[in-house]
Structures are given as C-alpha cells and as structure tokens.
C-alpha cells in the first residue's frame, strides 16, 4: 500500500500575506538530535540559504509547518557548522527581508531562542557570493539574496531525497530512430498533455525503495511505469514494467525495491532509466496515447542526469560532465535521428512549475499575431492574439525568424530581409526621423516604411599559411522607399541557453572584463552598460549581437515590439521616428501573463550536449583552440547565480564559450551605427554551444552577425581587431590542425 507520508511530497506556494504583522519575523535554528530545524516565524514565503562545513551554498524554499516556515538539515554530527541566512516576505513593509549571515555549530542541544532579526551568534560569514560582490561602476545585479526563488527541484528530507521534473508527452520512444518521432511536438501539445514526475528516493537515506509519483494536469487512464532499460527484444524494452496505482484523478504512484536488471535489491548507485506510458482519459480532443521523456536517475544522488548510451543496445549511462554544456539543463544524447529538432526541447531538469507554462509559451512563439494561426498543422488558432500585428512589422510570428529555434540563413539575392533585424538611426545614436530604430519592411495596410535586400556579395580571396586558398564574402545591401544613412543588418541567432546566460552573476563577467587591456594581451573586453526599460537602473547587457538588452524578458519584449509591432508593459510604445506617421500612442497588447510564458519558454530551452568526448581529433582541436587564443574571449566555463528565480538555472556549471563582453573586432566586421555604448566595430562574444548542430537544425550554415560566413573557417577568418591574433594563429596552422580545431567546434 502506498505510504502517502513518505511517498508524496507536497509543494505549497503561499500567495497570501500576513495581515497586521507590524514587526519583522523571529527566526533561528533549533537542534534536534542529529538534525537542525531552521525556522522563520511567518507563514508567507521564506527561503533559506546555507553553507554546510564551508562547502557549496544551497538555497531552498522553506515549508510551512505548524504556521511557520521550517527547513530541516539532517545527518549532522557534533561540531559540524552551518552558515545560514534567510530571505522572507515581511507584510509590515510589503517587502522581502534578508537576515544577517549567522554560523550555527551543531551540538545536539537546544540553544536559547534568538532575538528578532538576529542569529544565534555572530559567527563567520560564508564565502562571498555574486550578490555580495557587486560589479564595479553603476551596474545593478539582476538577482540577489532578496530575489524570491521558485521551489528547488531536489529536496532532501530525513527519509528521502525527492526529485521533481516537469515533462511533456512524446509521440514515440527515445531510441526509435526509424520513426524519427521523439523530439517533435504533436498537435494539441499545449492542452492537457504535461505532467511532472516525482522520484522519492528512500534508498538514499537507508531505506529500501524508490517511489515514483506522476502528477498530471488532466486525468490519465491507468498510465504505465517502466524502469531499468533492457533493450533486447525492442528498443523500448524494460526489466521493470508496472501500472501506476491511481491515488486520484491527478496523482498516480508506483514503487520499486528490486533492481530486475541486476537481480537484487535496489541500492545506491543503480542506473534507473525510467519512462511513462501516457493514456489520457477519454473522451479527449485529439490523440489519447503517448509516451513520456526518457530520464536517467542515479539512485542515491538526487536529480535526473543527462545520459549517453553504450553498447549495441544503447543502454543509458551518465554523461561525463564535460558534455554538460548547459549544466543539468543539458539534453541527453539524441537517439531518434531528428537533427532538426535539437533546439526545441525542454531543459532536462525542468521544474514542475514550468512544464505547462513552457508549452503555452511555445504556442505563443508559434502564433501568427495577424490571424492567430499556429505554424504547425493540427493546432487551433490562438484567437486572443488575432489582430495584434503591426501596423509596421518584420515578421508575423516569433518562429518566422527563429525557425526551429536555430540560426537563420541569408535569403537569396534581391529578397526582402525578413529574418534579419535591420537597425537604423543616426550617427549620434538618435532615431532615424522617418524609420525610428528598426526598418520594418511589412505593413498590415498601406505602404511599408522601407525594406532592405542583399543585392549580391563582394568576394575577397586569401591563402592559409600552408598555401591553401580561401574566399570570404560580405553582403551588399540596397533599400526601397527609405534609405538609411546609418544601419546594421543582423541575422536571427539561435535561442538555446539564454536563460543560463541571464543567470550568470555580473561579478563573474566583471572579472573577465579588461577594458584598458591592463594585462597587455591585446584583448580589452568591456561590459555593455544598458538601461533597464522597466526600472531605469543600469544593467549588464547580455543579449543581442551587441549585448544591448539585459534580460530574456527585455529581449523578447523588444522583439515583439520592433519585429511584430506587438506592445507590452515593457515597451508600450511602437518603434516610431520623430517625423513618422501612424505609429504614435501607447498600449499593452500582450498581457504580462502571456509575456511571462513566452519568456519562460525561451529561458528554459534545453542546451544540447557536447559530443565526441573521446574523439582524439576533437580533443586535440580543443587544445589548439585554447593555444590559438580563442578562449580569451570564448570563455569555456562559467557558473550561474544561486539567486535566479528559476530553479532550473541556479548554481549550474555551464560551458557556453562566451564572456558576454564587447570586443572591437576590426574594420572588416564594423558597421556605421552606434548601439548604446557599443561602437560600430564592437560585438558581443557569441556563445558557441550548439554551433556544431547548425547545419542539422537550420538546413545550412551561416555565421557572424550578418550571416556572411558560410562555414566555421570563414567565421574565424573574419576576426580582426582584438581577434586578429587568434585568427592569424588559425590561418597559420597546417591543414590537419585546422581540421582538428574545426572538429572541436563541431562537437559543441
């Protein structure tokens, strides 16, 4: 019989505030045997931040127990230390409060109660964090200790480690490459077809079972549970096959205490691959039978891990961490032969709160804001967004430019650029009088303000150090209706990993900046300081070819405004030049709730894993990449903040190969349009993760800000300015070394 006390963990999100609380809350810690109970005497939300024995910092949303927030740390021995602080909502000021860092030393006895707004002793503060070390200058960090956090996806209790992961339904099984139907999205994917899986691992705490709970948004009809991959008879065969027990219409449970793969009791370290067979209760609109994502859970560890495969049956094994490009958001090794769908996936560690919002955000991403239609067949129009397009616009939907969420390709010559952003303005940074800040080539009625097209390519030639020839090209542009004097044509970039880039602490980027080239290495990257359009404070620019926006939300809202003509609370006024007609006024066409869904979708796209981890050529190429000086700007590894609101993005070690800084890349890549503090020659270091999948996702290759580079070699050869030395080092390599370096890039 299912024991709900240990088999179910309930996440409670408290939306109401205390009434009449005029004082800050009392907080502290009470020892209890080998445990310590941390508490905040409030029943609004509260978070604990703690460092155990000077190890890494952990951040958790506390739970309400007997009217107050509590969190218990278990397995303590006398003398162990915990440095801790709390962030909690104080209704007396309608604000969040941070408590001072305090050190607790476990003794197993109960200390005197602490006074309000104080800890048990002054103690020693924990190591500095991103929130405690602000960047130089006026930049205000996005996230600090006072940022409200969504619930963690892994929770540790006295009896279990509990993992929760949000998911969507799938057409076929993960390894069925003959069908190529695992990574794509089926009709009505946004309707009644998400759930989350809860893994309650009692083995991790000395117990003898793992309970898997399935939480749904729509009633399921006797879903199946499979665990421990077998793969002998079919590519979807498992040793453990059971039917979930129905607890209620939205909760189903099953337990495992025997590792049928090994013929023994389940134990710590077991590789437990799991899959759910989904059957929607009928009658239901559309198809009723599906499969879940395939996950690998390592018993005793907590959290699902990206997996690779081994042997002829392609059994799942934990992916080496060198392959975790996006930390735990990293996608498992693809086995369904769908190269075009690699950038469409949910983060591997998606939180339950994100699952339904993700698919609804994807629906908005694929919606035509003119007629409300969905870009994929079988999906009804989203009628609430009909008629919001324009009047001037570039494309009718997000996906029109970001096809498969990948890099766009230049269109044929003399074709209007509708998958580019053509920024315009004056040499002093002011708006173009008749165009504003964007050239919008389409209009819902009347004559468009103007259009740009590539009329041809100017080709130049050169030779590598070994005498091998190469050709480079640059686009030639022409305009209709209005010809701007200052402009910058920028092709649509890939979208994966943006949430992780937002989560990098400003202090980490500040540590990489060297605006005056103080170390004399010829690299002088600088942070782009941009204005927050919502608060007016100065932020670190992170997104766009010149790092001109600070957050994913701002980037999405700007694209909606300037590319689709859809206003939001972030940008309520349309792009409009001072002498331009028909674009004045303010409005909010897309509500914040819808903008939030779209932002969450973009933020939580899974990052593909690095591949070919044991390939000798690619590994040699990595060394050549570093030795050539490429990594001086394309920083391999960074760690995200502990304070990002989304649990999926917090505390992740990622490998984006960017420093998010502006670098002068020389006259060859320069345009004549200033962008905030960025000059025409300065460009943000673009991330390299996923770059080796470009051809499969986009159906071709195009790199750099205007798509001029037809392959990775050309992209490198265009580097000038601060990138000139690295470019020359590449050009002077022999053919074998150049190919090795390219093999490394293609493995990313």
Q: Residue spans of the language-model regions?
A:
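Periplasmic c-type cytochrome electron-transfer domains
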Residues: 134-748
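Generic secretory/membrane-interface signal
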Residues: 10, 14-15, 69, 73-77, ...
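Sec-dependent, cleavable N-terminal signal peptides
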Residues: 1-24
